[in-house]
């Protein structure tokens, strides 16, 4: 599952979570 998260720098980052 690809979960879009907002990093502390404000940039939008897509993290791949294998769940």
Curated annotation (Swiss-Prot):
Enzyme class: isomerase
Residues reported in the UniProt entry to bind substrate: 9, 11
GO BP field: gluconeogenesis; glycolytic process
Catalytic activity: D-glyceraldehyde 3-phosphate = dihydroxyacetone phosphate
EC code: 5.3.1.1
An example Gene Ontology molecular-function term: triose-phosphate isomerase activity
Record-given protein name: Triosephosphate isomerase
The organism's taxonomic lineage, starting at the top: Bacteria, Bacillati, Bacillota, Clostridia, Eubacteriales
């Amino acid at each position: 599952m690809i979960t879009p998260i907002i990093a502390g720098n404000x940039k939008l980052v897509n993290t791949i979570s294998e769940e």
